[in-house]
Every structure is written in structure tokens, then in C-alpha cells.
A protein has these predicted regions:
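Generic beta-sheet signal
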Residues: 4-8, 74-82, 130, 155-159, ...
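Short active-site oxyanion
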Residues: 25-32, 104-108, 156-157
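A contiguous loop/helix-start segment that scaffolds small-molecule binding in enzyme catalytic cores
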Residues: 2, 77, 156, 163-282
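Glycine-centered tight-turn and secondary-structure capping sites
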Residues: 92-94, 252
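General beta-strand structural signal in soluble alpha/beta enzymes
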Residues: 34, 109-112, 159, 184
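Conserved helicase motor
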Residues: 55-63, 136-139
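Class I SAM-dependent methyltransferase SAM-binding "motif I" and its flanking Rossmann-like core
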Residues: 95-153
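Glycine-rich, flexible N-terminal cofactor/catalytic loop recognition
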Residues: 1-59
Length: 282
């Protein structure tokens, strides 16, 4: 009988952030396929787990998957882990999972830590729906396409960025979509955890960029393409400004400017809507 491929989420920083079930699976499987066996060794040692490991990263996944599938076909259970968080989310593992599915092997998720959801939950920005965009490309042509895609999004987006590119990326985001509300997380769950909230311009002033991968949550405005957009009512504008001032901590003036840009209105038009709502008692 074939074994099972377990997709195991591991801590994104604090080694205590791992489920009892994940620890049991890591102890019981025959082999752990790890993005970096050295980093995984620290986690296993912390929890006294002696299961053998093998490397599975972006440079060897295509060639290594076949041998792992053979072990699974032979009845071995295998756990897939990344350096941090949930495998395949901007991490290796997708090829192995697809190969296992094609081979009729059971793939079972073991949920747990996620930098995406951790940053989103603590951001104070709307979370009912969001778009995850991974890492912005590094090549100029690809970055241009990536930012053009972001500009067409209306709502909350989450993406990762490296420390040596975070300021460049946030400045480019500001030029593309305006000074939108953001929450920028660094070293989440670690000793030097930092989560900076506010408009991009203010967040950049307080941002430390010395180390640690960044997780960015941003509330992007309406699409600026030629599609028809229904103008929001005065009540909707007032409610939107209220959410920004209450949850993100923006001043009323900044919230008005952001809402105006988002909906293609003048700040005076939005201000008048707020004043009209006050007078009518809405």
C-alpha cells in the first residue's frame, strides 16, 4: 500500500509555534523532505525528533521528486517541510505534490503557521478577501508588469520582499497606487518582531531594513483602467473613511485623500460628503 505525503507547516520564527499533530507526523514518517536540512535540524533537535531528512529545494526538486515518489509507492510516509511556514507558498514542493497526485498517492495537509495570515490578521486592514502576490520580480520588465497588475486590484494584497529591496519596492508601490494604507511585518514571531502600520510614506520613515524577510499587507484602490466604476454613495464614503481612521489610525485628512484617489474623486468631493453626512446625522 502506498505511503502518504504530508505537507507540514512549520514555525515562521518562534520554534514553539508548531502543532502537536505536526510534531507527531514528523516523528512517525520515514523521511522528511526539507528545503534546507540544516534549518530543519534546529527544529527537530528542539523537539527531540530523530527522523532522517533529505534536501528538496528549487534547484533539485525536479530531479529529486522521482526518487521520493518511489519511496512513497513502496509504502514509506514522507513529510514535506519548507524553511518556514507552509510548503509551496512561495517555497518549493509544488512539483513533488503534483507528481504524487499524478501517481495516485495521498497528499495530506498538516496546517499551521503562515506569514501571510499572521501579517494579515494583525494588519488592521480588510481581511474578508485578499490577493497573495508572492515576491515581486527582480527583472525590470517583469517588475513593471507586476506593478501594473497590482494597480488593477481593488482590495487587500499581501506579498513578500527581501530586506535589500523593501524600500525600493514600497516607493515604487507608492508611485503606482498612491500613499495607500499598509502594514509591513518584519521578523514576525521572532524576538525583534516589527509591524509598522500607516500610509506608505509614514511606514517607510519608521521601517528598519537591516535584516529579515518582510511581509507586506496593502489596501489597494479601485482599478484605474477604462472599465466602468459605480461611484460610491456619500454613506459608503463616510463608512470607508471611518474604517480607515479607526482600524489603521490614519488622520481624517489622509483618509479622505486616499479614498478620493481610490474612487477617482477630488478630495473636496469626499470632504463635502463627510460634512453632508454630519449635517444629516448619518
Amino acid at each position: 500500500m502506498p505511503g502518504t505525503l504530508f505537507v507540514v507547516a512549520t514555525p515562521i520564527g518562534n520554534l514553539e509555534d508548531i502543532t502537536v499533530r505536526a510534531l507527531r507526523i514528523l516523528r512517525e514518517v520515514s523521511l522528511i523532505a526539507a528545503e534546507d536540512t540544516r534549518r530543519t535540524a534546529h527544529l527537530l533537535a528542539r523537539h527531540a525528533i530523530a527522523t532522517p531528512t533529505t534536501s528538496l529545494h528549487e534547484h533539485n526538486e525536479a530531479g529529486k521528486s522521482a526518487s521520493l515518489i518511489e519511496r512513497l509507492r513502496g509504502g514509506d510516509h514522507v513529510a514535506l517541510v519548507s524553511d518556514a511556514g507552509t510548503p509551496t507558498v512561495s517555497d518549493p514542493g509544488g512539483q513533488l505534490i503534483r507528481a504524487a497526485i499524478d501517481a495516485g498517492i495521498r497528499v495530506e495537509p498538516i496546517p499551521g503557521p503562515s506569514a501571510v495570515l499572521a501579517a494579515l490578521a494583525a494588519s488592521g486592514l480588510p481581511t474578508d478577501s485578499f490577493s497573495f502576490l508572492g515576491f515581486p520580480p527582480t527583472r525590470a520588465k517583469d517588475r513593471k508588469s507586476w506593478f501594473a497588475r497590482v494597480k488593477r486590484i481593488a482590495g487587500t494584497v499581501v506579498f513578500f520582499e527581501a530586506p535589500h529591496r523593501i524600500r525600493e519596492t514600497m516607493s515604487e508601490l507608492q508611485r503606482t497606487v498612491g500613499d495607500c494604507p499598509v502594514a509591513i511585518g518584519r521578523e514576525l514571531t521572532k524576538v525583534h518582531e516589527e509591524l509598522v502600520r500607516g500610509p506608505i510614506s509614514e511606514a517607510l520613515v519608521h521601517l528598519s531594513d537591516d535584516r529579515g524577510e518582510f511581509t507586506v499587507v496593502a489596501m489597494i484602490g479601485q482599478s484605474t483602467d477604462n472599465t466602468a466604476v459605480v461611484a460610491p454613495s456619500e454613506t459608503e464614503l463616510v463608512l470607508e473613511i471611518g474604517r480607515m481612521t479607526a482600524s489603521v489610525g490614519l488622520t481624517k485628512r489622509k483618509a479622505i485623500n486616499i479614498v478620493a484617489r481610490k474612487h477617482g474623486l477630488t478630495p473636496n468631493r469626499v470632504y463635502d460628503a463627510v460634512e453632508a453626512a454630519k449635517k444629516s446625522g448619518k
